[in-house]
Amino acid sequence: MAADRDNFLQNIENDSINNGQAMDLSPNRSSSESDSSILMNVNDIKTLRLDVAPEAKSTQSKKSLFYENSDDAEEGEIEERTNKEEGQYHHKGSKQLRFEVGKESTGKLQSHLSDGSATSGEGNVRPWEFRKVIQAEYRERLPRNYELKHWKKPSKIMIGSILRLLETNTVSALDSVFEKYEKEMNQMTHGDNNEVKRIYSKKERLLEIILTKIKKKLRQAKFPSRISERDLDIEYIYSKRQFIQNRYSQELQNNERLEAILSREQNLLEETRKLCMNLKTNNKKRLTEKLIQKDLHPVLNKAMEYTYGLESTNGFMHPDGPVTFRNDSHELNLMLNDPIKSTADVRLDKEEVLSLLPSLKEYTKKSKELKETMGQMISDSHEEEIKEVFVPHHESHQDKTEEDIH
């Protein structure tokens, strides 16, 4: 009976294993994760056996977290995926290039394939693939015409500086998260501080594990060769920030001081300009007064008048009138209340002038008589001169003719 019972259980176990393999190899396997887990539990013969004690949950299926995967396994998966993608694209390219196509079409095809592979590679990047993530971030932040050709693995100093930056933010990140979800934590723990501390310490250990994982991945990643070790050092970043702030404040102070100096110089320039104008006008007035009073040397009078514009070429100053007339009026004490009328304003008839000035009649009469007498005297004198010249000549000519006759 015992042997038959063991054979029966063995047959059931073999049938369940065969059914499981057939389900795994079937192409139309489209059930959900919950259904597959139920089938696995049903098909597992050990769960149905009553003569064997059930195994612990930890030994049955141990759940692996995303940060606990081994680096070698992850790298193997990445290499297998990249090889498969390259094989697929190579196979597609070889199929399309079997036909005779022009060079332009083949170039377009190759560029299209390269663009497609790049986009698919960037789209399928996982967070822990630091090499691809770093390259994608640098290419996204840098301009399109800038190309990074040389990459290198980070040094220990660079990795230490990056981890130092992350470690300084872990405490603040934990505190901010616990402050944000304080009500939920109190509701879940019913105000038990020990439970809250336990959760806090658990999250600290989780962050420590993540940091160790980041450290391992950073060793395998690559950074641009132009980045130096000190660019990611927290002390260098802080000192550089402080230096820039101090320099900026210094430049602001210098700018304010220059603005104050500039405004002061502008005010001084305006004052000097006004002073020069006042001095020029005062010198002009003083020189005119001295020229009027003739306090200067007589040799300098005319030169000063022409040099300082006190007298123009026509003998007149611009606002004050002729200098000579002012000198004469000052010397002769001429005080004229009425303005002098010009000849253009006097419009009188000849009869009115003769009536006002009777002496002009005598003057005109005498001038006429003088003209007549002068003309008569000139004519008489001319006649006498002509007679004196022509009469002796005529007599001499008559004598010569008589001599010739004889």
UniProtKB/Swiss-Prot annotation:
GO CC annotation, single: COMA complex
Annotated positions of the Phosphoserine modification: S70
Protein name: Inner kinetochore subunit OKP1
Subunit composition and interactions: Component of the heterotetrameric kinetochore subcomplex COMA, which consists of AME1, CTF19, MCM21 and OKP1. The COMA subcomplex is part of a larger constitutive centromere-associated network (CCAN) (also known as central kinetochore CTF19 complex in yeast), which is composed of at least AME1, CHL4, CNN1, CTF3, CTF19, IML3, MCM16, MCM21, MCM22, MHF1, MHF2, MIF2, NKP1, NKP2, OKP1 and WIP1. COMA binds the centromeric nucleosome-binding protein MIF2, and to the outer kinetochore MIND subcomplex. OKP1 interacts directly with AME1, with an NKP1-NKP2 dimer, and with CTF19-MCM21.
Biased composition range(s): Low complexity: 26-37
Note in the entry: Present with 2688 molecules/cell in log phase SD medium.
Biased composition (Acidic residues): 69-78
Gene: OKP1
Signal peptide: none
Statement: the UniProt record of this protein carries the keyword Ligase: no
Bias (Basic and acidic residues): 79-89, 97-106, 380-406
